[in-house]
Amino acid sequence: MVDAEMAAFGEAAPYLRKSEKERLEAQTRPFDLKKDVFVPDDKEEFVKATILSREGGKVTAETEHGKTVTVKEDQVLQQNPPKFDKIEDMAMLTFLHEPAVLYNLKERYASWMIYTYSGLFCVTINPYKWLPVYNAEVVAAYRGKKRSEAPPHIFSISDNAYQYMLTDRENQSILITGESGAGKTVNTKRVIQYFAVIAAIGDRSKKEQATGKGTLEDQIIQANPALEAFGNAKTVRNDNSSRFGKFIRIHFGATGKLASADIETYLLEKSRVIFQLKAERDYHIFYQILSNKKPELLDMLLITNNPYDYAFISQGETTVASIDDAEELMATDNAFDVLGFTTEEKNSMYKLTGAIMHFGNMKFKLKQREEQAEPDGTEEADKSAYLMGLNSADLLKGLCHPRVKVGNEYVTKGQNVQQVVYAKGALAKAVYERMFNWMVTRINATLETKQPRQYFIGVLDIAGFEIFDFNSFEQLCINFTNEKLQQFFNHHMFVLEQEEYKKEGIEWEFIDFGMDLQACIDLIEKPMGIMSILEEECMFPKATDMTFKAKLFDNHLGKSSNFQKPRNIKGKPEAHFSLIHYAGTVDYNIIGWLQKNKDPLNETVVDLYKKSSLKMLSSLFANYAGFDTPIEKGKGKAKKGSSFQTVSALHRENLNKLMTNLRSTHPHFVRCIIPNETKSPGVIDNPLVMHQLRCNGVLEGIRICRKGFPNRILYGDFRQRYRILNPAAIPEGQFIDSRKGAEKLLGSLDIDHNQYKFGHTKVFFKAGLLGLLEEMRDERLSRIITRIQAQSRGVLSRMEFKKLLERRDSLLIIQWNIRAFMGVKNWPWMKLYFKIKPLLKSAETEKEIALMKEEFGRLKEALEKSEARRKELEEKMVSLLQEKNDLQLQVQAEQDNLADAEERCDQLIKNKIQLEAKVKEMTERLEDEEEMNAELTAKKRKLEDECSELKRDIDDLELTLAKVEKEKHATENKVKNLTEEMAGLDEIIAKLTKEKKALQEAHQQALDDLQAEEDKVNTLTKAKVKLEQHVDDLEGSLEQEKKVRMDLERAKRKLEGDLKLTQESIMDLENDKQQLDERLKKKDFELNALNARIEDEQALGSQLQKKLKELQARIEELEEELEAERTARAKVEKLRSDLSRELEEISERLEEAGGATSVQIEMNKKREAEFQKMRRDLEEATLQHEATAAALRKKHADSVAELSEQIDNLQRVKQKLEKEKSEFKLELDDVTSNMEQIIKAKANLEKMCRTLEDQMNEHRSKAEETQRSVNDLTSQRAKLQTENGELSRQLDEKEALISQLTRGKLTYTQQLEDLKRQLEEEVKAKNALAHALQSARHDCDLLREQYEEETEAKAELQRVLSKANSEVAQWRTKYETDAIQRTEELEEAKKKLAQRLQDAEEAVEAVNAKCSSLEKTKHRLQNEIEDLMVDVERSNAAAAALDKKQRNFDKILAEWKQKYEESQSELESSQKEARSLSTELFKLKNAYEESLEHLETFKRENKNLQEEISDLTEQLGSSGKTIHELEKVRKQLEAEKLELQSALEEAEASLEQEEGKILRAQLEFNQIKAEMERKLAEKDEEMEQAKRNHLRVVDSLQTSLDAETRSRNEALRVKKKMEGDLNEMEIQLSHANRLAAEAQKQVKSLQSLLKDTQIQLDDAVRANDDLKENIAIVERRNNLLQAELEELRAVVEQTERSRKLAEQELIETSERVQLLHSQNTSLINQKKKMEADLSQLQTEVEEAVQECRNAEEKAKKAITDAAMMAEELKKEQDTSAHLERMKKNMEQTIKDLQHRLDEAEQIALKGGKKQLQKLEARVRELENELEAEQKRNAESVKGMRKSERRIKELTYQTEEDRKNLLRLQDLVDKLQLKVKAYKRQAEEAEEQANTNLSKFRKVQHELDEAEERADIAESQVNKLRAKSRDIGTKGLNEE
């Protein structure tokens, strides 16, 4: 990552990674790999140095400080090249050793780079200053980055954990460990800050929580200030040390959004509340309150602002330079507000804190002449009592005179001052601890939300390892916790990692890193360990700290290597024992441990607390359980009952839960390092840091990372992600197993195939290889995208070029035309043509102008209209767009809901499958357990028999002891003059008797008894030795006593082993039980979540049911409106019948009036015809109305059914489309993310290209340097050739080899130049060739170094040869002068010379080997280049395939976009049609109401006519004149009659016209109705397209209905107005009637008219009677149908209610069944669990038996082997003796030979050279024989020693086998007891299961009955519905 990319980190960049300039400087820095080393140093551990010389296995070097030191060669360690300076991951170092790690950390720390990767974990060093590396800019830069993509940081660790959680769907944990003051708390806060920020990015919409106090992420962050105020304090090493441990779990939803959080705390240091060391202080909250930042607090708490006024908090320092208590108080108070604490809760906490300060000031004194305490002043007590809501006198009385329970009564007990002070401190500590725990619980309640949570990330911040001058019980608990965490780290890093390799079948040799801390852990927590002994001592009333110390020393001193006796130093606190922890040796002081562990309280004061008026204090102690055991006489304090639980036991329980939680997660480790003890920024204390690195296992973690396979991927995931590297290796359409596909793919890649291994399910990679594959993948994607971009740019360029060509052609045509015009424009005829041409067209032009003006006018009008239309359409478009947006939002919401529902459904299905599989597995295990239970029962009986035998043995031992006692008494009678030692012997024997009884009572005292018996035996032995001369009889008794002691010792050891094994197995079983309980709880939680989701789905279904019911209610409203129309029609029928009745009355009156004329008869006939016509019209209208109503009812029913079906279909189609949409959306997101990654990879590759060019330049310069060095070597070789003498032939051969090496180097240099040119030409392959260039450069450096070594060796060889030549010359001269005397020296010189020649030959061979290796390197590079070219071609092919896929995807996307637009247009058209239908319906209703109004008008006219007839009748009756008189005026009346007749005809014409209007209105009504039906049919068809908007359409219909209602009201208003007009017309008509009456005074002319009228009336009466009969029949039929319909509705409602009741009963029964089923399932699971435990015990018993058998066989074999080895030893001893004799003989022979040699020398002086040579040959032969004999002798001695060791090993193995046999036998006894307990539990579980099964069957029976009742009710409902439909059908047919 270059500087430009680091710009994203802002001002933090220099503190995270070194700059590009610094990296270049490091690469060019001079460095000598052979001379630059590290040497050890007493003060600094290691220092850098330069080697000056090497001599005799020692090295002389000059340190960087100028000091010259000489050290052994094996103590010298090489430095890494400068390019590795400040490396970010120390696993990448070339030379991995302690000084390399130390100096890398030191150099990074000097540049303020405090974070460094160390293999799989991160190391951070406390900077002791603020660094700008935690701001929001840095958080954003690290979000979503891989570990290799960003510098080391705590944010990177956090983001990796977050990504692992989402991808692996596994809970994560981050363990931040280190010593106190190393920076754990700060890093924990940064982790929480990071998670809160990235979770808030995905959840910004949730601004405020239900509390209204702040967002969830704010609350999580603000929990820290509150916890730190009450739980952090200043210590010697840390100003803000956490004095409690916390495990913060941050829960996330399935999508990674923040869901909730919770905090678990461990081991608050209560003692700090009342006591602090000098350099420390109390918890921060005390000093924050006293800072006077909030003066109202001081007034409320009745305190001053001086800390020294309060004893509890002023024992150490009171201020800290780095902490502003005033600002911290405001931060704490603000944190309480954000966390939702009420004012009352905050004030209560402040009051209790102030009360504790006043508590420390309460003083007490002794009463005069009494050992009784009394208060020394009550002021402080009054203040404390006031703040705590207590009575001051009661508080003081409870402290000084507490009430204790003795038997069944309470008595008052006196207390001395020391006891009262202790009780006061204990109460203060208890109040503070419980208040702290309450605060944590309150914070957890705030952080707990109702949001669904899927996974969590736990952050562990626990008190670091502590080594103080004074270490007490709290330090032991803290250090024990850190020991367990370090063991967890070691086990995870070094054991589980290697076990994973074994499990996957990878060839791996197990490496023991020596990091096992189990011995120290067992010493603390196992039975008879420190905590076990402490708890045991707490049970005994008279136990003290010293008895606890004595037991510790008796059990562990000398027996455990981790337990030591301390060295007390003057000036330091006393220490009682020492423990060797992983971080160092700690001296512990045990004063007060028993009290701290029991933690007793004054119960009288606690009872006052329970009754306090301060609610918080009373709630804190509401659940306190006191001491119920009565006090016996002579005993000081009461013992706790069965509920007693010590602090150590509680801590171990919490610690075991924590470790269980951590084991269930994927851990990430952060190691915090403290750089110095003085808190100085930038200073590294080398010894201190090295000690922490060694303890933390940093080097071992790096080694396992480098040697092992830290990265692993499942085969399927690997194939999916990396197939792009070589798609041809895994064909697309062919099925290939994932593992085979991965093997083919990796085999086809150009990588080191030794860097990965194939397991059974995963492929494993060494460190760095996975990163290389990622780089190759990024490069491949970059090439593909580059190709796509090139093709796209090519297409665009070709399109632009085509446009340019077309433009050019157009320009050429224009130019040609202009040139032609310019050639003819001056031609006279052309000028004439130009002048005449306009004149010819002037007339036409004028016409055209006129037409154009008209056209312009029209267009202008059209434009105005179109503008108006456009504006109208724009307004409509705006409204439609708004509606569309609303619909889209609604659709999006529905899609989101549907997606969530589908996701929940899938999760439920998966969980169901998993649970079913687990149920099946547990069932099988239960069956196996039952079988094994029977077998174990039989074995249990056998073991009980063995136990009875053991009891008999114990009885025999008791008898033996009784005999010993008798003999002891007899001895006492015989020997009266025993000394004081004999008296001591008597006391020891008495103790032995008591201890024997104690052994029978309790096996827990076995170990103490054993020690006592050993002391007794020793004393007895001493007494026996002293008194052996005086008491011979006592000797026999003592021997018997020894035998008894041995028997007891064996029995005790056996019992002790039994006890230990039993306790261990119990603890293991408890752990297993806890794990299974937690699993059950987890499964219960998952089941509850599933039930909640099911309830949500049911709620959604109920909502849909409500919507359907609303639609049905709407339909019923429409039916009611239709019924109203029917009632209106019935009213019309009633009016018609009334009219008929009135006509009948008129006809009767006319008949009474008498005769009728012919004119009247004709008029009657005419009116009768008119009435018949009107009746037929009315009947037709009635039939039409009935038919219309029937059709409407049928249409309505059909439409309702079709709408229901369409709604169902639409729901299914909607689900399908939403699913497809989500799939395409996911694909689009994937493609988008891939494009972004490809673009980023391209940018990275371009930057890498520039870097590679720089590296090429460096490589070129280095190659030139290499060439110069080769030339220098060639010149040196020429010089050496001139200097060599006699060895010229050999040297020539060597020089030829050297020249060959030189040529190879030159050739290699030339190849490098070629490679450089190829790199320049092949830009696309730069990334791959970069690795080759780096390796080549490294090889070149190594070759140059090797060449220098060869040159030096060669120069040394030449010097040796020249020296040898001189020596040869000297020896030649000396031999000539004195050959015989110097023969031996000459031989030695020859040997030396031969040795040197041999060394030279070996050097030459080494040079040859290096040359061959260079040749191999060259070939390898050529092969890599060829492979890279193949990769390039493959990448091109993959790019083409990807381009094709991209085009296909674009097509699919375009199709879906088109479908979406079509659906939108269809939606708009359907909305328009709906609006048009609503307007048509409104018009239709208006027309219908107008027809009703016309009908009313006709009725009124008819009524007026009837009144006119009645007036005429009255006039006829009143006229008593004679007919003669009437005849006179007949003529006048006839004239008037004609006028009236014409008027009547006009009225009839108007009546006919109105009837025509009615008919036309009826026809229009029918047409509109038909049109409406047609459009409704079309609407039904289009409802398929408007599926998502049916609810909106219903709303629009509701709106239109409201509009219709308003229009109907308007029509009624118009109707009333018309009725008023009609009344006025009626008045006018009455006036006309009066005129007619005056004209009708002459009745004669009207008699004929009356007769006609009478006839017509008769006909009308008859017709009216017929109509009345028909109407009566129809009304009766209608009434019957109406009654039946009402009865059917009542029946339907009754059945509906019964059905609902049945369904409710069914639901309740189902719930009961489900509850019983869950109970039964839990019982079955318990049963299976017990069966699994039984099977495990069975297997353990079988394994134990098998191990016993194996041990017996091994013992037998060892005995035989021992016998054989003894025989071999004897043989070897004989051989050795023989060889010794031969050696002596050979020595004698050598002496003889030496004597003969002397004689030979004398003869040589005389005899010459031949005799000397013979003697020398003989001497050499003898020397060879002597050496061979000595070798054989040495080998025989080695064999003898080896045999002795083998015998010892076999003896030891036999002893171990015997011990194992005894231990296994004890284990069998123990397991038998466990089997019995499990059998009992299994029987109980089986009984409970049977009970639940019977309940289940009962409920199942009730459920069946309820279902039967529901079926019966449903069948009745169906029958009634069918009957209702039949009746309705019959009624319609009859009508």
Curated annotation (Swiss-Prot):
Region (Disordered): 1907-1935
Keywords, sorted A to Z: Actin-binding, ATP-binding, Calmodulin-binding, Coiled coil, Cytoplasm, Methylation, Motor protein, Muscle protein, Myosin, Nucleotide-binding, Phosphoprotein, Thick filament
Any one biological process term the GO annotation gives: adult heart development
Coiled coil residues, start to end: 839-1935
Phosphoserine modification, residue list: 1137, 1269, 1510
Domain Myosin motor residues, every copy: 85-778
SUPFAM superfamilies: Myosin rod fragments, P-loop containing nucleoside triphosphate hydrolases
Residues where ATP binds: 178-185
Domain Myosin N-terminal SH3-like: 32-81
Modified residue annotations for Phosphothreonine: 378, 1282, 1309, 1513
The keyword Cytoplasm is annotated on this UniProt entry: yes
PANTHER family assigned: MYOSIN HEAVY CHAIN, NON-MUSCLE, MYOSIN-7
Function statement: Myosins are actin-based motor molecules with ATPase activity essential for muscle contraction. Forms regular bipolar thick filaments that, together with actin thin filaments, constitute the fundamental contractile unit of skeletal and cardiac muscle.
The protein's name in its UniProt record: Myosin-7
Gene: MYH7
